[in-house]
């Protein structure tokens, strides 16, 4: 492991994160790197508010790249390509000792390839593996040309990289495991989980397109469920930039939810929730770690659905199912995302059913599956970043 000895001169590390989740990872990594290098480090790159609090001045607002959906990407393609060129040029001009790309592979990997072509000696670490195990597995082998090490958030990913002949890959741990204590209930909150009326979480997504696709079907699902299950305490979790859009959407719902915004409110809601209706994604792993049984749903545009049906190679698209290694969480995707399917499944997990018990039993395995030993994920990530940087020839 890397020691904490400061370099003789300040190290320069260029980081690129273009989504909020990557921004949080980058911020935690920056904190540890600064501590390990005794403050003899300068950060440059692209990031959001969390990385800005650690001193990063972003080349451009990451909101420029918060685009989802085939049609939206096509419309914004000239701007995206310009940002890729600008970012690669900025890396070259900065002459850093290390480049760390964080998630968002459609953007960051294009930057990395350009940088590797112009600065072949610059070490590049990829923090958050692309889903090579789910689709386009040939990417793993291709990454060997421009990535020196992959930092994996999921425990099964290193073996997938070995199988696919990709670059070295190390499981450093998912940041969610550092938040487990804030997600799980104390004794009083556990009593609330079991008390009537049941608290049902609704998580339609964090992007505008997801709100557009999910809110109507989720509202109708709750109407159907209420007819059968009776009174419920429905809590809808959303993001600050979506709150007005969400309020407009729920105005027509027969059952009005409490709308919660912010991390503390979300964690408090997780601790007392009996069950959840959620879109697919990382939030399924968060709910599983919190011990909240769930039903998952997802609707996308027609083009995205057509592509997904032809390229996804896994038996489930639910992250929690993949980490557990068992399809315990029901998933209703695209044309199957209907109130007729969702309401009965939710009714089942709200009661003490075999499905609910099976989910809870599977969720209890996650601590052992995702364990990282004595060090936090960001500490393990920093170790490999420093080892890779020290092993390189440095700037040309």
From Swiss-Prot:
GO terms for biological process: lipid A biosynthetic process. GO terms for cellular component: membrane. Coiled coil: none annotated. The keyword Metal-binding does not apply. The keyword Nucleotidyltransferase does not apply. It catalyses: a lipid X + a UDP-2-N,3-O-bis[(3R)-3-hydroxyacyl]-alpha-D-glucosamine = a lipid A disaccharide + UDP + H(+). It holds the Pfam family LpxB. Keywords: Glycosyltransferase, Lipid A biosynthesis, Lipid biosynthesis, Lipid metabolism, Transferase. Condensation of UDP-2,3-diacylglucosamine and 2,3-diacylglucosamine-1-phosphate to form lipid A disaccharide, a precursor of lipid A, a phosphorylated glycolipid that anchors the lipopolysaccharide to the outer membrane of the cell. Belongs to the LpxB family. This is Lipid-A-disaccharide synthase. It comes from Nitrobacter hamburgensis (strain DSM 10229 / NCIMB 13809 / X14). The lineage of its organism: Bacteria, Pseudomonadati, Pseudomonadota, Alphaproteobacteria, Hyphomicrobiales. The gene is lpxB.
């Amino acid at each position: 492991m890397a020691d904490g000895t400061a370099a003789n001169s300040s190290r320069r590390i260029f980081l690129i994160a273009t989504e909020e989740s990557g921004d949080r990872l980058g911020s935690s990594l920056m904190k540890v790197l600064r501590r390990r290098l005794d403050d003899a480090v300068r950060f440059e790159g692209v990031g959001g508010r969390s990385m800005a609090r650690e001193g990063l001045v972003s080349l451009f607002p990451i909101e420029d790249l918060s685009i989802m959906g085939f049609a939206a990407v096509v419309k914004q393609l000239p701007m995206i390509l310009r940002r890729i060129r600008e970012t690669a040029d900025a890396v070259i001009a900065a002459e850093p000792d290390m480049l760390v790309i964080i998630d968002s592979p459609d953007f960051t990997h294009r930057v990395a390839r350009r940088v590797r072509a112009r600065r072949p000696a610059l070490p590049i670490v990829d923090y958050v593996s692309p889903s090579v195990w789910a689709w386009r597995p040939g990417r793993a082998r291709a990454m060997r040309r421009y990535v020196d090490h992959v930092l994996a958030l999921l425990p099964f990913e290193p073996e997938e990289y070995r199988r696919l002949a990709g670059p070295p890959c190390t499981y450093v741990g998912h940041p969610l495991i550092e938040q487990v204590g804030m997600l799980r209930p104390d004794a009083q909150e556990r009593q609330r989980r079991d008390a009537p009326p049941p608290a049902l979480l609704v998580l339609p997504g964090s992007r505008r397109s997801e709100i557009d696709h999910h809110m109507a079907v989720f509202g109708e699902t709750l109407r159907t469920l209420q007819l059968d299950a009776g009174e419920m305490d429905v809590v809808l979790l959303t993001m600050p930039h979506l709150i007005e859009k969400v309020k407009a959407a729920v105005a027509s719902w027969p059952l009005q939810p409490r709308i919660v915004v912010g991390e503390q409110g979300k964690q408090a809601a997780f601790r007392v929730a009996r069950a959840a209706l959620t879109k697919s994604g990382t939030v399924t792993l968060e709910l599983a770690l919190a011990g909240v049984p769930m039903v998952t749903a997802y609707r996308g545009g027609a083009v995205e659905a057509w592509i997904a049906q032809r390229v996804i190679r896994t038996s489930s698209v639910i992250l929690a199912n993949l980490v557990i290694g068992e399809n315990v969480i029901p998933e209703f995707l695209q044309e199957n995302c209907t109130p007729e399917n969702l309401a009965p499944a939710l009714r089942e997990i709200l009661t003490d059913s075999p499905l609910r018990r099976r989910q809870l039993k599977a969720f209890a395995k996650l601590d052992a599956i995702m364990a990282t030993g004595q060090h936090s994920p960001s500490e393990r990530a920093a170790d490999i970043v420093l080892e890779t940087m020290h092993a390189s020839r440095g700037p040309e």
